[in-house]
């Protein structure tokens, strides 16, 4: 049998053995060492079998392999070191050896160099230099290896200071490419990942000559507790990487959605109150946060040790206990934080001094020591509460809260915060852990106060400065999601927590109730704006009754916008901004007018018609033609469209000469942050489904639909559409393509609909059970239905087809996509113009669940 195949089989069998030992909870350190030793044996045996031991070539392991750590599918990095020139025979044999290792299914990284070339390249490239630091001789001339070993430890190879600067800059560049809290993190290169631990080890190796992290304790650079924490973090990340390699069967460091469940299972997690995958990711996010803090502190200490005080930092006294050293705050006593009050007082000074951006490393070390020693929550201490309220009331309080969160003091102060640290939700909507999302929400509140944000958040920038007490909004933000992961309604549970906190901290009853109300209702404005018909006066009146007054409305608006923007980078767009602003101003008018005075519907219709007619007459449209056209339209049409929309539609219809052909309009300007699409044609079965199928094929998102029929059975359907990135459809060629595709489909009595797109890789791991619920309708003769389902391609077209088959007419729709979930709201009636009865509701519900659940199952398999 081919020896390469035998080697390949032996590696497969060894991986199976390693996996069995991993499942049996063998320490991961043993497994990565065992893997390395096995590869050592295989490589050295192959070296001898190829007769390479007769040549003066040193076979050297470098990089992670040189460290003696190998995960199941890690790269095997080799340096073939020689002096002078290689003979042709040696070159040929070496090529055959490398090919053998590839055939054996080892991921080989290799270089063939002379000693002089190796040192020259190492001096020019920090990556090569780092790999050489971990060089380990496998076989070959020891004297040649010793020359390399001695040369790379000379100061003229890389000075300790230059090496530190290069590795620090390398890390900064790497961190800029990804967040520690990505949904699909790279566990090796993300901030707080394995590379950050290795960076500490590399800098130590270069500066102290240390070969292991443990030696840093001997050099009194690392405290025993810090070493234990670093090794504990490394242990978990190694286990995670090992399981990831086993799950995907290749060298992979990205923890992608489609393997997270399998990795969690291999790690031994089981579904309980929290999903297994959420438990695993919570541990991961907490681990990387710890690594990030240790990395920051130790590299700051290394900087002092390697660079010294090359540039004197400005020192400014703050009080008897603190001073500012450059951009860092420094405690003047190592035992200052033995008083719990001073742990919080530190951040009061940070809030008060805009020049402070971080904590000086020795002070951070003292803070970490004191934080671990706390036996009860800091909020139990009255002096801590007093200091915390100072932070909350200060204009720069959020900057201080941000650092409190970063360094674990917020969780030491507020026990409930600890519960949400690292808490993720296994979905595509929440891009961050609950604590990181809340942290970003706080930063958004801070952004609203900045003049440069007025263009992006025009209303929020005004309201934030009009709030009676900004600190109450900050408290509402801190508590809005604090009860997530406990089970039950997190809004109500969080509201109770918030009220208790306010009482403990001496807030008056009014302020405490306002904060609790904000927490309990933090989703109400978002849901109303995005999933209800806010052109309906009854919807706005109902929302106004929940809001109570203009002050509550302003607080809720600011919290809602900051919350949406902090959920993920793609959630906020101009369309959502316009919906929330419209709801804000509509509610403001209701509150100013008084909820008891309803809108005069007839007066509004006359007002809108008059404004539209004035503009149309100015454009040369004949009043007689206009009156004739509008007599065909129902009053509801004028209520649901602004005067400029009414004018746009009317002018196009009156100028449309091919009356038997469909009219499709796509606005060249944005309408409330989106692109408006208008379809006018003879109404017919499956019209909505046809339009949805075409738009899906064009990769267009539909966010709003108003489905209307004239008295003489013409469709007057309006849609708000956006590109996949949330931006309006603006390219002229794109607009023309959409219009032509719709005209072609609508011109046929039996159109051939395009095939739906395939489900994306990210969507496949998710299974959203289809839910259909009917709500109490406040509009005569209509039914209101909510649909929750997996957001599969062509979903709305399929829903429209089911409406047709169930003899149901769609009047309007609000389309909301929350990650992998579609949460859509429809206003329906029977084909006879009546409200659906219980039997009809049941039939429609069963048809939707049956059809969409089948699609859900097909898509995720």
UniProtKB/Swiss-Prot annotation:
Domain ACT stretches: 676-756, 784-861
Q: Where is this region: Uridylyltransferase?
A: 1-317
SMART domains noted in UniProt = HDc (SM00471)
Regarding activators and inhibitors, the annotation says:
Uridylyltransferase (UTase) activity is inhibited by glutamine, while glutamine activates uridylyl-removing (UR) activity.
Keyword Hydrolase attached? yes
What are the UniProt keywords, alphabetically?
Answer: Hydrolase, Magnesium, Multifunctional enzyme, Nucleotidyltransferase, Repeat, Transferase
The parts of the chain that form a coiled coil are: none
Q: Which Pfam families match?
A: ACT, GlnD_UR_UTase, HD, NTP_transf_2
HD domain location, by residue?
434-556
Write down the EC number: 2.7.7.59, 3.1.4.-
Q: Which GO terms describe its molecular function?
A: [protein-PII] uridylyltransferase activity; phosphoric diester hydrolase activity
In terms of domain of life, where is this protein from? Bacteria
Catalytic activity from the UniProt record: [protein-PII]-L-tyrosine + UTP = [protein-PII]-uridylyl-L-tyrosine + diphosphate; [protein-PII]-uridylyl-L-tyrosine + H2O = [protein-PII]-L-tyrosine + UMP + H(+)
Q: Which family does it belong to?
A: Belongs to the GlnD family.
* This protein's domain notes: Has four distinct domains: an N-terminal nucleotidyltransferase (NT) domain responsible for UTase activity, a central HD domain that encodes UR activity, and two C-terminal ACT domains that seem to have a role in glutamine sensing.
This protein's name: Bifunctional uridylyltransferase/uridylyl-removing enzyme
The organism of origin for this protein: Shewanella oneidensis (strain ATCC 700550 / JCM 31522 / CIP 106686 / LMG 19005 / NCIMB 14063 / MR-1)
Encoding gene (name): glnD
